[in-house]
A protein has these predicted regions:
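Phosphodiester-processing cores and adjacent nucleic acid-binding clamps
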Residues: 1-143
Length: 143
C-alpha cells in the first residue's frame, strides 16, 4: 500500500483542532455503504461523529459514477438523520476537462502501459480514471 494513512488510535490521540470529512468512495463510511451495507456504514459514521461532533462533515462528490450516486443517497440520509453538515467536494487531477487525455497518457507512462490497454482491474487491464470528470470545476459547473 503506497498511500500514507493512519489508524483510529492515532486519530483519537491527535483529534483536537481537526476537521474531518467522510472521504471519497474509499473512505470508511462510503466504502462500507457500497461493500458491507448501510448498517455498518452508519455505525462507522457514529464513531466519527462521537469523536468529532460538529467538526465532522459528510463529503459528497459527483463525478458521474453510479457508485457515487448510490453512496450519496445514503450519505444525504445519514446527514439528515444525524444532523451532520454536508460538504460538496470534487477530486481534481487536472485543471480542465480537455486535459483528461493528457492525464491518462501520464498514467500510462508511469505504469509502462499502452493507452489502448483497457482500463480495469486484473491481468490485461491498466489503471485509469473511469471518466473525464476529475477536473477542477468552476462554481457554476460544480453546482
Amino acid at each position: 500500500y503506497y498511500v500514507p494513512r493512519i489508524d483510529k488510535k492515532i486519530v483519537e490521540q491527535y483529534k483536537s483542532d481537526l476537521i474531518v470529512l467522510t472521504g471519497n468512495l474509499y473512505g470508511e463510511v462510503p466504502s462500507k455503504i457500497l461493500n458491507l451495507g448501510d448498517k455498518q456504514a452508519e455505525e462507522a459514521l457514529q464513531w466519527w461523529s462521537e469523536l468529532f461532533g460538529d467538526d465532522l462533515y459528510i463529503e459528497l462528490m459527483r463525478h458521474g459514477q453510479e457508485d457515487e450516486k448510490r453512496a450519496n443517497q445514503v450519505l444525504i440520509h445519514f446527514a439528515q438523520k444525524h444532523q451532520i453538515k454536508i460538504l460538496a467536494t470534487n477530486i481534481s487531477f487536472y485543471t480542465s476537462k480537455a486535459e483528461a487525455n493528457a492525464h491518462d497518457i501520464l498514467l500510462c507512462v508511469k505504469e509502462g502501459e499502452k493507452q489502448a490497454t483497457p482500463i480495469g482491474r486484473g491481468r490485461g487491464f491498466r489503471f485509469g480514471l473511469p471518466n473525464q470528470e476529475y477536473y477542477f470545476k468552476s462554481f457554476l459547473v460544480f453546482c
